[in-house]
């Protein structure tokens, strides 16, 4: 399904320029070629690792050209509603739907530093380390004020103990509201 537009885009002049190479004068990749890339090339472990690291590498390039004065990392989960029998999709009682429950780490400019697609029935803070630790590692030696934000789901001792031990990071965390008085 991810390659639905490949045939139409394979003859698009702008897409052919973006792809480059033979595509400039001929067609860009067909649906079957795109499907092979997705299933045979992108799923190789080294390629998955490269794809996961790509947003950070891009942000690092921008940061070299335009240094930042402070770093704000914002960790948050979201809902991605699903339909049909998609692998990993599950009912989430909080969102009241069949979904995936991805977690994102954004920076102060709203750029996605890292993300992880998760099953729909996991808790909001599930696998926070997988997303946050590589981002913190990238910024460890950067000499700027660092702030971490997260909602109540991330107000867990393991997370803020790691922040205190690893790097000097301030962290206002939201607390769940109690019943209204």
Which residues does each PLM region occupy?
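DNA-recognition alpha helix
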Residues: 2-21
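Active-site-proximal, Lys/Arg-enriched surface segment
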Residues: 21-103
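Electropositive, glycine- and tryptophan-enriched low-complexity nucleic-acid-binding patches
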Residues: 92-142
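Alpha-helix capping and helix-loop boundary segments enriched in small/acidic/polar residues
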Residues: 24-25, 116-127, 147-154
